[in-house]
Amino acid sequence: MNNEKETVLELKQICKSFRQGSQKLDVLTGVDLEIKSGEIVALIGPSGSGKSTLLQIAGLLETPSSGEIYLNRQNCSKLGDGLRTLLRRDFLGFVYQYHNLLPDFSAEENVMLPQLIAGVNAGTAREKSRWLLERLG
């Protein structure tokens, strides 16, 4: 029996450059990253090292200058905005550095809220929220 976990996110040779006036600024050069199901990954580095840019690319919010992005083995590198939006909605989640819970809501209600905004019915959202809270503690 094969116990190897499935790769859920893979970045291959990701490069990202920006223009500052007439200068080209290379922010990421040849980054490879593979994340398997159930893994927890931390990106650490000094300010300006490209962490946020890499996360924006991995989250399909930013397009790399070159390289490939695979989500559940599907090459997402050349997808249009509509399909990228659907993949973000269905498979990705973000917790931003400066996040705030809604103080008048319970933990369960705070977890339910993005699902309800996405159109998930309340029963399903509550069930999934409880599962997530139990899993994450």
Give the residues covered by each predicted segment:
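ABC ATPase NBD coupling module
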Residues: 22, 76-93, 122
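A short, flexible loop at the N-terminus of ABC-type nucleotide-binding domains that lies
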Residues: 4-8, 17-30
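Short beta-strand immediately N-terminal to the Walker A/P-loop
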Residues: 41-42, 94
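Helix-to-loop junction immediately C-terminal to a conserved catalytic motif
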Residues: 59
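Short coil-to-helix segment of the ABC ATPase nucleotide-binding domain corresponding to the Q-loop/switch region
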Residues: 105-114
